[in-house]
């Protein structure tokens, strides 16, 4: 909140792009200060070459994986801007912004939480797999309706929120939302592989995926000369990434292909039905703002109702977890009635 106030204040003062710099630096400073105050650990003027050697043998692969991923992502925007111009780049980036907004914070949370938790049971592959399955099922159950719902309401959302001048970004929004749909799954798989000390595998996957992605990117830009093909290429590269992670999950922790599909498909299938339903609502003859509100309400009611009627595993798990956390007696009773014994 403080960093946002600083950024907005600097923008009103007319400092231009420096407002973003001020907001970012303020946010980083406050984060560091809060961690310093709340954490008992303090750095000491000591250095262990033995520990540094152990950390570097593992950490350089993780670092290089992140660098390769970042370079490939920035290269795509750079080439689109150079080859097709700022307008096409703006439509592409706008299409990526909203699904990225939904997924990025969740993905960061998954990375920060999953790695230390999974590392504690790295020697117990059965428990490790069980925790991965729970994370995948719950993550896809929560995210699929948001992302597939965004695909369903894309037309009314763009017009109502951004205005009609952004209509050309709708195809990119739909395609790139599918890209982000599988990110939590691949992130969970990545953290499980890292937790057993196999950072070499995540580096291998990232290199292969990015070689494929760059090859598709150049074909889309210089062969097909289409930004839309760039978006499809991004989706294809994500499918390759997902396939490789599925292979290594099966190989390393015994998370079989059948189990992975069993965990992914229920949430995605229900969300797809919801997406089709909310998309049909756009034909109701009312203004775009009201249509968007109606789509969101109908979609949410449909998703929760079907989850309740079918007693989906992730729905039951979340309700039981909320029941345990709730201190309100009336709320507990309501939640308990939602789970059929």
Stretches with model-predicted labels:
Residues 17, 54-62, 79-100, 129-131, ...:
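Interfacial/gating helices of multi-pass transporter permease domains
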Residues 250-257, 264, 276-341:
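Membrane-proximal transmembrane or re-entrant/amphipathic helices at the cytosolic face
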């Amino acid at each position: 909140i403080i960093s946002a106030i600083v950024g907005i204040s600097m923008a009103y003062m007319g400092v231009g792009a420096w407002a973003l710099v001020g907001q970012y630096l303020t946010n980083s400073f406050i984060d560091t200060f809060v961690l310093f105050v709340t954490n008992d650990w303090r750095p000491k003027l000591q250095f262990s070459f033995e520990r540094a050697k152990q950390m570097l043998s593992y950490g350089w692969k993780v670092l290089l994986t992140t660098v390769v991923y970042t370079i490939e992502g920035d290269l795509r925007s750079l080439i689109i801007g150079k080859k097709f111009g700022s307008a096409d780049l703006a439509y592409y980036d706008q299409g990526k912004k909203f699904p990225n907004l939904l997924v990025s914070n969740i993905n960061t949370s998954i990375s920060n939480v999953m790695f230390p938790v999974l590392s504690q049971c790295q020697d117990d592959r059965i428990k490790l797999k069980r925790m991965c399955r729970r994370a995948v099922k719950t993550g896809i159950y929560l995210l699929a309706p948001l992302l597939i719902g965004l695909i369903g309401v894309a037309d009314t959302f763009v017009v109502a929120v951004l205005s009609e001048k952004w209509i050309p970004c709708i195809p990119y929004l739909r395609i790139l939302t599918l890209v982000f749909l599988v990110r939590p799954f691949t992130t969970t798989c990545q953290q499980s592989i890292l937790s057993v000390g196999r950072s070499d595998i995540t580096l291998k996957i990232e290199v292969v995926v990015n070689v494929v992605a760059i090859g598709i990117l150049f074909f889309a830009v210089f062969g097909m000369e289409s930004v839309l093909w760039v978006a499809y290429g991004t989706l294809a590269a994500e499918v390759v990434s997902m396939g490789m992670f599925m292979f290594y999950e099966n190989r390393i922790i015994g998370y079989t292909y059948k189990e992975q599909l069993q965990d992914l498909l229920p949430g995605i299938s229900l969300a797809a039905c919801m997406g089709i339903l909310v998309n049909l609502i756009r034909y109701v003859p009312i203004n775009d703002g009201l249509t968007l509100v109606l789509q969101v309400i109908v979609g949410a009611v449909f998703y929760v109702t079907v989850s309740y009627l079918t007693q989906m595993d992730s729905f039951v798990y979340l309700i039981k977890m909320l029941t345990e956390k709730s201190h309100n007696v009336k709320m507990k009773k309501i939640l308990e009635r939602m789970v059929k014994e």
